[in-house]
Amino acid sequence: MTDTRADGVIGPAAPGEPGTATGRPGKSGRFLSLATLRTHWLIGALLVAGLVLRVLALIAYQPALIYVDTLKYLYGASPGSDPLGYLVVLRPLLLVGNLTVVAAVQHLAGLALGAALYVILLRRGTNRWLAALAAAPVLLDAYQVQIEQMIMPDVWFEVLLVAGLGLLLWRPVLSVPVAAVAGLILGSSAPVRQIGELLIFPAALFLLVAMAGTGRVIRTGIALVVAFAVPIVAYCSVSYVRTGHFWLARGQSTVGRVVSAADCATLRLPADVRPLCPTPAEQRFGPDWLEHSKYSPLFSAPIPPGAKRGQLISELTSAIKSHQPLRIAGGIAGDSLRLFSVTRDPSPWIAPIWRWQFQTHYPVYPHWTQLGPGNAIVVGVQTKLFGPFHFSVLKPSYGGPAQVNHPIASFLRSYQLDGGFTPGPLLALFAIAGLAGSVLALLRRGSPRTRALAVGGLLFTGTAVVLLLAPDVFEFSWRYMLPATVTLPPAGVLGFSALLSLGRKAGETPDGPAPGPAAPAS
């Protein structure tokens, strides 16, 4: 049997306590449940609040929210632009239900993320109040709830991420089989969102810092790397058979980022390339517009007869990278700080934030989605960039016409815009604490408990750096910042707990002095 210790960690129950064979018969389950609820009441309250938000989202928007990228998974739009691992979850759910069922399951996954983070941090030795603090953002952040209501793969990427990191941290000593399973799970995130390819780097760093013994590190590292590669290679192999391309997807271009940083007035360019270089007014529309809009000078500027536009764009970006690299780096650095801003205001520079906010109406994205007679959802499928759209009504099996419960939608929107998201300064504090814990881990300072907390903080902090900084190399989007809710809070809590542990006297626990030897049972 297990019970909850004073520090909030689930462990063996002491003899004679409720829940053991020597406790009061017939009441062990009730005592255990009451004790657990009393001990973990805060995470319980957060889970209930998170559940209420998700039920409201389900009621507010029927059958679910559909975004431009949703059509890639439902109709095969824009083939090759993103990996399609999401279909492994989506197709079975659509066999038994419609898009509402998919959204409901995604909301359950969001709740599970909060519970999982709480348990992982308790297992690692944090205070239960701090563990609940780390779980609160993913449970209560309206941007997280909105993406769960949308038919998009993001929540499943987070599930695989937290599951893989949790396995790496589950036991004090990482075994080869557990490392292999963790690698397999983390590698499976890449076919869901391509940025998952980068997760091997923080995981490998964790192994190097957390484990002792060269032989053990090598064996465990090989198991992790090989297992990580298996789902990626498998997906790429299937892609090669079907499309002739051994890839997850064609990958995102840096063209928009590079040309948005250019000072075209001082840049030396060939005469046939110069018309493609954007003016300051055009640059204010940001990297996304410059790279994807047909009105961008990259695609609208006249070119000489016989010239290839793609070659001219390549010459332009090469010149900018060679002569103005600091301007590119400055643009990336500036966007990387947006996550920590006090407010989330619309900006023409970045992808419109309203895409990730609850609306009082059913959101549409002409020509990709729009509403027809009777609020029927009409989708426009485009198979190539700037190609023609093929329109049809949403398949009946996916759900009926768009329906919005306006009072609930208004409440959700007000909640989101009036503070129902994780504040940027709080995320900054989490990041600073996580970095401090990472320094402790790298310096190998403190007691075994301190180091366990510090290396856990290192793993989550490294993961956050990879997942949050890498997208900024291409363009900033609030959607790409969503993994912050499942990486920065646990990183900060683990780092802060490591600092507390470092300053605590030996023999103390997170909740006070260590208990003395238990009296023998009478």
List where the protein language model places each region.
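Start-transfer (signal-anchor) and selected internal transmembrane alpha helices
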Residues: 1-54, 220, 224, 456, ...
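Multi-pass, polyprenyl lipid-linked donor-dependent membrane glycosyltransferases
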Residues: 68, 102-111, 136-163, 168, ...
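Transmembrane-helix signature of polytopic, membrane-embedded enzymes
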Residues: 117-140, 158-159, 172-181
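Membrane-interface anchor segments at the N-terminal boundary of transmembrane helices
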Residues: 38-41, 97-104, 330-460
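Transmembrane signal-anchor helices characteristic of membrane glycosylation enzymes that use polyprenol
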Residues: 38-65, 139-140, 227-239
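Membrane-interface alpha helices of multi-pass inner-membrane proteins
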Residues: 135, 179-193, 227-235
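Short hydrophobic/aromatic helix or loop-helix immediately within or flanking a transmembrane segment
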Residues: 75-108, 483
